[in-house]
């Protein structure tokens, strides 16, 4: 094995941050970038009102509304490691893009608000992590505000997410009595001060919790800390690296991202124990990152990162081997050879050319409509990486143009936005009006805004009676009969796949009973199959 390749792989950490909206994910992201030297000033949440936007929020609508609705990729060094941070949408209506991004991550940092504990979106995201046994470290945020008792938060994680918890730091008070944390992993006392916003908080090594220095520093809270630490150590589990790496146990840290407290404590441990790039599954076998041949998989398409050029960028995770500028790779769905001369790396919306990349790295290649989510690339063996599916939309609207002469622009815009997978556009087998499908209502607003902003298309949406969607498959003869009898309810999505839109759950159930040889699928895999011309 090439020792350089081995070294490059083992110092990489490719991870995502997940949270419920407003738990502090964007703030934590910026503090990590600050620690890695990737940025020199954190765009704090309050600064949005002063028109300074968060580093990872770059779309116009995100800037205006102060939410993250797309996923960004940020690469930065930290303590000799090479970090690839996949920043995911925090808004509840953008979970599907998050699902796909999680397939490109080897581990996850989960951010919880100490006042709320585990919330609904966190549960949904955990379903995807559980599918892949993704290792998770938990950061309980906003300890400088009043919230739930720490033991209640641990119990909530264990009961709701079915994860064993092992606290590696323990808070001393909360709200206006928050004095800091005790690092159970390194036996250090970290003292909190609102004045130390740069994260350089005082650390005191403590060999023995009976050390009188604790009483001098913490006063009456010293005995509370001793009691809590004794309880946690006697009743709780010890850190089990194999259980963590298998997605069964989550190390837990407490802190305040806004005050930059506890972030370094958590992140130092994260880079030490988080896994390097892992094998990636394909239809035929698992691909080891240590294999010599280059392989990669497209897990995301983003249209109009540069609105001036209406570009489409494919985000490709390097799965094995070494990427080199100008190398020729086979695009296995089409069978065509591509020369990758202009691959890029990312820092939110900023990109720069990349000469080399290793497993775990994310590179961007211009797709020009040729690359789809789930497409596989390699220099040799034809492989098809398995991907997280699209999920059947739960909300539907009909698109109406304000100017009918812009129909071609509408079609182009919906096609490109659909390729991102954030919105799903369905065109009826009979008729011309597009039906939009989304997993959350806010996606419709985003689609209208982006059509206007990026494609100069003014449109409005009207309600439709559809309640649910299923992708259709089955024997050719049965499909032909099914189409003939259900023409008014059948559509093609942007990928050309046949979908059945039902007026109610009851109607769907009846149709499924009447057509037992037809498959009605609530998900659609993005594993790309060959379509050679």
UniProtKB/Swiss-Prot annotation:
The keyword Ubl conjugation does not apply. NCBIfam families: prfC, PRK00741.1, small_GTP. This is Peptide chain release factor 3. Increases the formation of ribosomal termination complexes and stimulates activities of RF-1 and RF-2. It binds guanine nucleotides and has strong preference for UGA stop codons. It may interact directly with the ribosome. The stimulation of RF-1 and RF-2 is significantly reduced by GTP and GDP, but not by GMP. It comes from Salinibacter ruber (strain DSM 13855 / M31). One of its GO terms (cellular component) is cytosol. GTP binds at residues 19-26, 87-91, 141-144. Residues 10-278 form the tr-type G domain. Belongs to the TRAFAC class translation factor GTPase superfamily. Classic translation factor GTPase family. PrfC subfamily. SUPFAM superfamilies: EF-G C-terminal domain-like, P-loop containing nucleoside triphosphate hydrolases, Translation proteins. It comes from the Bacteria. It is found in: Cytoplasm. Keywords: Cytoplasm, GTP-binding, Nucleotide-binding, Protein biosynthesis. GO terms for molecular function: GTP binding; GTPase activity; translation release factor activity, codon nonspecific; translation release factor activity, codon specific. HAMAP family: Rel_fac_3 (MF_00072). Its main location: cytoplasm. The keyword Phosphoprotein does not apply. It holds the Pfam family RF3_C. GO terms for biological process: regulation of translational termination.
